[in-house]
């Protein structure tokens, strides 16, 4: 999608679905978009690693980590899995780590903050269900656009 989040907000008007949570850019690609896939997990990244290990086809993985910054859900190794498997980027309602490496990676990464502490790896979590944060429902199959102004979700890429 070639429209910026500001242009999408103007087009959608008062009904625009823009994320109110102020997520920071950590990846080397500040502008990214794609079809939404979702993971809900809390301080455990095994499931999202599994998802990013598969073909991304330009999709964006939205991770609802419950807003916890106690442990990082994504670091350089998992981000590289996503990048090399064709994912456009990840949006994490939680923390990341290896931020200096992420900044040099041609991959979109947005998150609440950083923490060097690694997460558990039990595989707890849920795939491809609607996740909600920042006043937005992230619906699998809908389209997400992320840039330096924020995140907007639209029903389709048209």
From Swiss-Prot:
Q: Where does substrate bind?
A: 75-78, 97
Q: What does the note under cofactor report? A: Divalent metal cation.
The entry lists its GO molecular-function terms as:
4-hydroxy-4-methyl-2-oxoglutarate aldolase activity; metal ion binding; oxaloacetate decarboxylase activity; ribonuclease inhibitor activity
Alphabetized, the UniProt keywords read: Lyase, Metal-binding
CDD domains reported for this sequence? RraA_family (cd16841)
Q: What class of enzyme is it?
A: lyase
Pfam families hit by this protein = RraA-like (PF03737)
Provide the binding site for a divalent metal cation.
98
Q: What is its EC number?
A: 4.1.3.17, 4.1.1.112
Q: What cofactor requirement does the entry state?
A: a divalent metal cation
* Reactions the enzyme catalyzes: 4-hydroxy-4-methyl-2-oxoglutarate = 2 pyruvate; oxaloacetate + H(+) = pyruvate + CO2
For this chain's UniProt record, which GO biological process terms are given?
A: regulation of RNA metabolic process
Look up keyword Magnesium and say if it applies: no
Q: Which NCBIfam families did the record assign?
A: NOT-MenG, PRK09372.1
Subunit composition and interactions: Homotrimer.
Stated role: Catalyzes the aldol cleavage of 4-hydroxy-4-methyl-2-oxoglutarate (HMG) into 2 molecules of pyruvate. Also contains a secondary oxaloacetate (OAA) decarboxylase activity due to the common pyruvate enolate transition state formed following C-C bond cleavage in the retro-aldol and decarboxylation reactions.
Q: Which family does it belong to?
A: Belongs to the class II aldolase/RraA-like family.
User: What's the protein name?
Assistant: Putative 4-hydroxy-4-methyl-2-oxoglutarate aldolase
